[in-house]
Amino acid sequence: MEYTVYKERLKQLKCAVIIPTYNNEKTIKKVVDSVKDYCDDVIVVNDGSTDHTSVILGEYSGIQYISYKENKGKGYALLTGLRYATEKGFDYAITLDSDGQHFADDIPTFIDRIEKSLEAF
C-alpha cells in the first residue's frame, strides 16, 4: 500500500491523529505503528497509565507525546490532545483509541470525509 499519498493529504489538510491512552501496554505499539504508516503528525496523550504504556511510548521518536501522572479520563485526554493540535496549527484532528478497537486503515475514509466537507463551502 502506498502510504505517502495519505501522509501528504493529511499535511495539506493540516490534520493530526490524536491517540488517547490509558493502560494499553498490550496494544499501544501496534496502534501507534499503524497510525505512523498513514500520518507523520501523531499526538499521543498518556492519561496517567500505571502499566508499561509510558515505557513503550518513550521508545518512539517522531510522535508528540503528552503524559500526566494522574488519570483524568478519556474526555480530558482528548481535550488535551485537541488543544495541543490547535496550538501547533492543525485545523483538523482524527482521534483513534489505543485499545485496538479502531483501525488506522480507516484513516483514508476520514480523509475523504474531511475533503468532502470542504467541498460544501
Predicted features along the sequence, with ranges:
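Short hydrophobic beta-strand elements that form part
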Residues: 16-20, 43, 67
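Substrate-positioning beta->alpha
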Residues: 27, 102-110
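Conserved donor nucleotide-binding strand/loop of the catalytic core
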Residues: 54-88
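Short beta-strand-to-loop acidic/aromatic patch adjacent to the donor-nucleotide binding site
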Residues: 90-101
